[in-house]
């Protein structure tokens, strides 16, 4: 489902969703949120998690992957930053195969394996509990999970710009450049690890079908 934040007039809440009386004990639900920079997707995800009284995971995945793998968390953070600065994404690689590389292998601390460990954590959490995932290609990693609802949050450029400027010391020109760079990185990151476009035709078809199934079931 694609959400234009500019159309949201009231905070996300059970009273506005037709979910009155619904509890997470009745049905496990995993919500994945991808978002444009400045659209408020992270805030929406956090609000939704609080409203539904379920955990919300974002950057915490790096710490959990570090603890699970024994790889220093700094390497996970460095990989995120390093990937932003190189032309790694010229071609879709689709490296995610659903398994991690063992410690005795040469590629144990490679960027690809760091992603594999994040994916492992995401799958394990989704098996255990209802939750919200923000970013991290979670929608693709959990694409075969029938309990997943995937959302892409976007907003008009002027809205994203104004919201981003309120939280930064950058001027308008600098922020526009930063927003474009960040969204391109997120799109390229997703394309590289999944082989799919961030929200291409294929993804739109999947989301429409998923919504129809929920709406009329």
Pin down the residues of each PLM region:
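Pre-Walker A (Motif I) flank of P-loop NTPase domains
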Residues: 27-31
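Short, Lys/Arg-enriched N-terminal segments with co-localized hydrophobic residues
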Residues: 1-23
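Short beta-strand-centered segment that lines the nucleotide-binding/catalytic pocket of NTP-utilizing
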Residues: 55-66
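Conserved beta-strand scaffold positions in the cores of enzyme catalytic domains, especially
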Residues: 56, 148-150, 206-207
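ATP-dependent NMP and nucleoside kinases share a basic, alpha-helical "lid"
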Residues: 119-168
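Glycine-rich phosphate-binding P-loop
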Residues: 33-46
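ATP-dependent small-molecule kinase phosphotransfer cores
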Residues: 66-130
């Amino acid at each position: 489902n694609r959400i234009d934040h500019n159309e949201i007039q009231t905070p996300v809440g059970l009273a506005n969703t037709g979910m009155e009386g619904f509890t997470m004990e009745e049905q496990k639900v995993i919500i994945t949120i991808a978002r444009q920079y400045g659209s408020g997707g992270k805030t929406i995800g956090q609000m939704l998690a609080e409203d539904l009284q379920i955990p919300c995971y974002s950057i915490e995945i790096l710490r959990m992957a570090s603890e699970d793998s024994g790889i220093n968390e700094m390497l996970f953070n460095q990989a995120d930053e390093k990937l932003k600065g190189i032309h790694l994404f010229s071609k879709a690689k689709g490296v995610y195969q659903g398994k991690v590389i063992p410690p005795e292998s040469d590629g144990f601390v490679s960027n690809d394996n760091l992603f594999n460990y994040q994916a492992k954590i995401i799958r394990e959490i989704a098996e255990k509990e209802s939750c919200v995932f923000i970013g991290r290609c979670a929608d693709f990693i959990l694409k075969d999970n029938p309990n997943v609802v995937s959302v892409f949050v976007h907003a008009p450029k002027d809205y994203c710009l104004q919201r981003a400027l309120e939280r930064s010391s950058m001027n308008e020109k600098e922020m526009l450049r930063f927003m474009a760079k960040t969204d391109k990185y997120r799109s390229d990151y997703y394309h590289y690890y999944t082989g799919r476009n961030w929200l291409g035709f294929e993804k739109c078809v999947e989301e429409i079908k998923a919504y129809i199934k929920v709406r009329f079931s």
